Amino acid sequence: MTDINFGNISRLEEFISRARRIAIVTHMKPDGDAMGSCIALYHCIGMYGSASAKIIINDRYPGYLDFLAAEVPDSDMIVHAQLPTEAETAIKDSDLVICLDFNAFHRADRLEAALTESKADKILIDHHLNPAREAFDLVFSETDISSASELLYHILMETVKIGHDASMLPPAAARALMTGMTTDTNNFANSTYPSTFRMASALLATGVDRDEILSRLYNQYGENRLRVLGHMMKDLLTITEDGVAYMVLDKATLRHYNVGEGDTEGFVNMPLSIAEVRMSFLIKEDDDRVRVSIRSKKGTSANTCARLYFNGGGHENAAGGKLNMPADITDITEAAGYIERTTHEFFTRNNEHKE
């Protein structure tokens, strides 16, 4: 991890100290890292005086994160999909906007216009490639780190209020940081660094109950999750000659199994356990587009593939994107052909085609 600029830490504390209303914003379809970092920052802002803070999210978080969200008053977490006017007004009325776990305003989807038009000071805390630096007054960007939650943790450790003492973190913030880091590393399975384990050790020393967090994250699913997983592995999983595994979930299947946000969490990683698979796709049909999750093994760039063919990007081995209809494909039935065609081209042009 690159050393954090101490001058920027001072500026961050100045921005927060003088703000009266703060909006904390993350990307669309917020995951554990997005919510963990936002909720942790929310709890820490109270250490800086009388500023009011609200978490503004584009759409609802997965149900397995309810235990974190329960520690934030309902009035301080606004979901645009449920209360669009209130969400946009909260951003407009804020004099400081802090964006976590995304690198450009368009990643906030329906909040993009409100963020672009906001006259507030804007701060970015993110671990993705190619941040839109020109859109922000202060940027903390680090890619050699596990998660936005870990980046936020190291920033907080450098502040005057925390002073390298994790026990000074509000307990709810410590739990949220551990949760965000755990989910983004797939429980320490990927994107882990020495700093990641130091963070985990320090948080455990403060009394964070990791066993409880793991139980909340991974042992609270509904039966439908296993049912749809079985269907996907038996009937939907396709593996190409290029070593690409993909599964396409259309709206009919999503409805049949009552698949909600978060119910397919982690599924895209599973085909990578197959020796000959080097890239895995999970395709989910939405109303006006197709959502794409991509994972890859070391030596194959999920990020490059997402940027070239799927209107997205992310990390080297974990990325996301979308297929627009009808611009990219006419309907979901064309998704399989699109994946096979584009990934074959991707591996061929990068001299990665399997012999």
Predicted regions and their residues:
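Glycine-rich, phosphate-binding/catalytic loops in enzymes
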Residues: 41-42, 114-117, 140-141, 199
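Active-site cofactor/cluster-binding pocket
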Residues: 78-135
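Hydrophobic helix-and-loop "lid/oligomerization" segment in the mid-to-C-terminal part
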Residues: 2-26, 36-71, 75-80, 85-88, ...
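Generic beta-sheet signal
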Residues: 56-58, 100, 125-127, 142-143
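Short, glycine/acidic-enriched loop or turn micro-motifs at the edges of active sites
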Residues: 30, 102-104, 129, 187, ...
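Short alpha-helices
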Residues: 127-200
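Short glycine/serine/threonine-rich phosphate/pyrophosphate-binding segments
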Residues: 32-38, 105-109
